[in-house]
């Protein structure tokens, strides 16, 4: 009111209402009685009294509410809309010319494709149903009380922005569990545990598969215990380890042929998964995957005419053990492994991570000093794409500057060390030049592997 008088204007005023209704999913607490923002019913009345005292009652034009992000259940939205519509109707009946209602955000994204409220990464409604409910609720309430229909506004940031961005990551290297060569045969001189495990592996069959699995686990545990006490040598441990994983692979293959798979065999895929090390930082590019276990659709974006033959989890290149993805969207459930192709020598292999446009780039941090990635803006028209702009990612020099390291001073110090080392004969002049060149290339280059 003071600013309006000083500026000699009649302001347009809006009030955010704290509804008792709340959303569903990860952000349910953004709404309801314990939410951070908004005025309760009694606080709204107090605010109206202040407006009247200031002579600004005709300036109240909008009410706003927000019950959370990624609302999974349409019923929660309907309940909130009914409550908000009554607030609107009551204000109109009290003589306030409110003509705008901001329904806030919350329109979710079906990340996992299940169209189900059972998953926090999905929603059980369509955009059309959401719009229909918003409009129908306020129209019906307004008609019931004989008041004007309001202008409706929504702030569906996640649903609007999630689809606009794709993260493309290249696979650098893979790691697989050791397996025993098919031609291996246990010898009489081998340790008893090796011979026992070989017999299990050699005679594995569907009828005794579960018992064989239990016996293989017991032998492995016994071998590890004996090794820790110096009673089994490294060669024996390695043979048992490799043979155990070979047994696991065959048990997994047999289990997939069963109509009813025992519970303890359902997650062998996860145990056997390859590790695909990819050129990215989870904390910079997909922070919600780490922080709140958000699911994003991930698929290979090449060799799509080939059936994937491997299953993997994704590892980033940070030194943090949390830098991995081990939950993936599949046709009808969440899987712990991603079907992928085996790598070919000297041929790049790329994975696409989709629906990352909502907040991932903004939330990303400099964990391990991995900076912003290269980015490309692409537009599509009439079925054809056009590269509009290319943005280079951050360099090592730039991220070091963020943490108060002066790159120029670092180079000077290294130059002084190289000069001194050449002078004292520790390194040759050629070695000094190469060392400085490599250092500068690293310092002024991309924070990811090139």
Could you say what each language-model-derived stretch is?
Residues 1-102, 107-113, 124-129, 137, ...:
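Active-site-proximal beta-alpha core segment in soluble small-molecule metabolic enzymes
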Residues 125, 133, 139-450:
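Charged (often Lys/Glu-rich) extended helix/loop segments that serve as interaction or gating elements
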């Amino acid at each position: 009111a003071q600013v309006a008088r000083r500026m000699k204007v009649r302001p347009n005023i809006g009030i955010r209402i704290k509804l008792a209704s709340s959303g569903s999913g990860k952000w349910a607490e953004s709404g309801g009685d314990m939410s951070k923002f908004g005025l309760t019913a009694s606080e709204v009345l107090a605010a109206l009294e202040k407006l009247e005292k200031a002579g600004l009652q005709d300036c109240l034009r909008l009410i706003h509410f927000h019950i959370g992000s990624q609302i999974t259940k349409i019923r929660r939205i309907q309940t909130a809309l009914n409550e908000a519509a009554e607030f609107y109707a009551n204000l109109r009946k009290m003589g306030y010319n409110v003509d705008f209602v901001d329904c806030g955000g919350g329109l979710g994204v079906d990340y996992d494709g299940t169209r189900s409220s059972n998953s926090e990464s999905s929603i059980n409604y369509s955009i059309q149903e959401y719009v229909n409910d918003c409009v129908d609720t306020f129209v019906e309430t307004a008609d019931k009380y004989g008041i004007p229909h309001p202008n409706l506004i929504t702030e569906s940031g996640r649903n609007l922005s999630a689809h606009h961005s794709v993260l493309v990551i290249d696979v650098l290297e893979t790691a697989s569990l050791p397996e025993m060569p098919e031609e291996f045969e246990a010898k009489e001189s081998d340790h008893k545990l090796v011979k026992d495990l070989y017999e299990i592996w050699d005679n594995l069959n569907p009828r005794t598969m579960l018992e064989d699995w239990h016996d293989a686990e017991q032998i492995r545990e016994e071998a590890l215990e004996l090794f820790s006490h110096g009673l089994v040598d490294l060669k024996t441990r390695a043979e048992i380890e490799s043979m155990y994983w070979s047994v696991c692979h065959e048990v997994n293959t047999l289990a997939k042929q069963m109509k009813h798979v025992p519970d303890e065999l359902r997650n062998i895929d996860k145990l056997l998964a390859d590790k695909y090390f990819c050129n990215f930082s989870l904390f910079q590019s997909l922070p919600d995957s780490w922080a709140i276990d958000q699911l994003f659709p991930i698929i290979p974006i090449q060799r799509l005419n080939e059936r994937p033959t491997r299953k993997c989890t994704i590892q980033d290149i940070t030194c943090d053990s949390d830098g991995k993805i081990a939950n993936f969207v599949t046709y009808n459930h969440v899987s712990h492994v991603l079907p992928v192709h085996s790598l070919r020598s000297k041929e790049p292999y790329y994975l696409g991570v989709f629906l990352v446009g909502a907040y991932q780039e903004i939330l990303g941090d400099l964990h391990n000093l991995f900076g912003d990635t290269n980015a490309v803006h692409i537009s599509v028209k009439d079925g054809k794409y056009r590269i509009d702009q290319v943005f280079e990612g951050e360099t090592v020099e730039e991220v070091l500057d963020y943490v108060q390291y002066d790159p120029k001073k670092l180079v000077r110090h290294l130059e002084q060390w190289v000069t001194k080392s050449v002078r004292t004969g520790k390194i040759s002049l050629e070695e000094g030049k190469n060392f400085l060149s490599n250092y500068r290339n690293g310092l002024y280059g991309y924070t990811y592997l090139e």
